[in-house]
């Protein structure tokens, strides 16, 4: 989990940092768990750009991740810890006692040779997956389901974890990484521990080329566009926005306006909204 810097041989190398990937044990993925990934370039079926700033980048193959962890009672041995280009966390290849191989999100502290298991009778040990009803209050967890059996949807990014705060009736109270406090059904599954790659958030990209390798294209400021391209465009030199507040390219209020629907079904499960930045 170390971060490496560089001598300032060029302006872009001055602040650039990279992960040393000390935890990674192999760079050859399991072929049976790879799927071809077709790039959209941000276009829909009609060829129109629906998501800006996407295109190019290094070719990738998708790693099929087991988010359900539904192979109960069968111990699995960690074979490798690997890099996944499709997510910020590292992944672990586990081999079950019956010979089946699966990828899981690797938690901090999981090493090659460790044995993990899923199911209600599992021990409270890093990497084990079990229903929230069987997890003690105060435990650090990740990879959390919102609907039992659907697969993990919450807390999957590098370095994140949630805390189990209480259990009452059919629901458990969780504090999420964003600061949000919400209810989750106690039959939903979660994995013990914190997601791997803790130093991900302090990596400095350093130069535009690394963003291009990731498939992210440049973002042009609206103020340097023409008035027919953006509400901020036009004027002589560095002109002000010309509106009470900043707007999106489509004329909607930007920066600070809440976009969540007022009457969303999940509002009743949220006790406290996420922290303001």
From Swiss-Prot:
GO terms of biological process kind: cytoplasmic translation
Functional summary from the UniProt entry: One of the primary rRNA binding proteins. Required for association of the 30S and 50S subunits to form the 70S ribosome, for tRNA binding and peptide bond formation. It has been suggested to have peptidyltransferase activity; this is somewhat controversial. Makes several contacts with the 16S rRNA in the 70S ribosome.
Family annotation (InterPro entries): NA-bd_OB-fold, Rib_uL2_dom2, Ribosomal_uL2, Ribosomal_uL2_bac/org-type, Ribosomal_uL2_C, Ribosomal_uL2_CS, Ribosomal_uL2_dom3, Ribosomal_uL2_RNA-bd_dom
Region (Disordered): 222-277
GO molecular function (one): rRNA binding
Subunit structure: Part of the 50S ribosomal subunit. Forms a bridge to the 30S subunit in the 70S ribosome.
Family stated for the protein in its record: Belongs to the universal ribosomal protein uL2 family.
Pfam families named in the record: Ribosomal_L2, Ribosomal_L2_C
Entry GO terms, CC: large ribosomal subunit
Domain of life: Bacteria
Organism: Clostridium kluyveri (strain ATCC 8527 / DSM 555 / NBRC 12016 / NCIMB 10680 / K1)
Gene3D superfamilies documented for this protein: 2.30.30.30, Nucleic acid-binding proteins, Ribosomal protein L2, domain 3
Record-given protein name: Large ribosomal subunit protein uL2
Keywords for this protein: Ribonucleoprotein, Ribosomal protein, RNA-binding, rRNA-binding
């Amino acid at each position: 989990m170390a971060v490496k810097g560089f001598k300032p041989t060029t302006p872009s190398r001055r602040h650039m940092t990279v992960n040393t990937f000390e935890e990674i044990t192999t760079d050859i993925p399991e072929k049976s768990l790879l799927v071809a990934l077709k790039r959209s370039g941000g276009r829909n079926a009609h060829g129109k750009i629906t998501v800006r700033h996407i295109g190019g980048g290094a070719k990738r193959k998708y790693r099929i991740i087991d988010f359900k962890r539904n192979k109960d009672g069968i111990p699995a041995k960690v074979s490798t810890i690997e890099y996944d280009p499709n997510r910020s966390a590292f992944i672990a290849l586990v081999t079950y006692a019956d010979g089946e191989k699966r990828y899981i999100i690797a938690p901090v502290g999981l090493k090659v040779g460790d044995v993990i298991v899923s199911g209600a009778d599992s021990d409270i040990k890093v990497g084990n997956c079990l229903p929230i009803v069987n997890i003690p209050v105060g435990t650090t967890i990740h990879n959390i389901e919102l609907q039992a059996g659907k697969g993990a949807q919450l807390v999957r990014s590098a370095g994140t974890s949630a805390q189990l705060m209480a259990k009452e009736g059919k629901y458990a109270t969780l504090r999420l990484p964003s600061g949000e406090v919400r209810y989750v059904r106690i039959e939903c599954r979660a994995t013990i521990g914190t997601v791997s790659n803790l130093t991900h958030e302090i990596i400095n990209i350093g130069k535009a080329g690394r963003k291009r390798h990731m498939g992210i294209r440049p973002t042009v400021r609206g103020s340097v566009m023409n008035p027919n391209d953006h509400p901020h465009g036009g004027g002589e030199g560095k002109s002000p926005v010309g509106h009470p507040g900043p707007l999106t390219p489509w004329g909607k209020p930007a920066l600070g306006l809440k976009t969540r629907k007022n009457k969303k079904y999940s509002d009743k499960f949220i006790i406290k909204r996420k922290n303001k930045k």
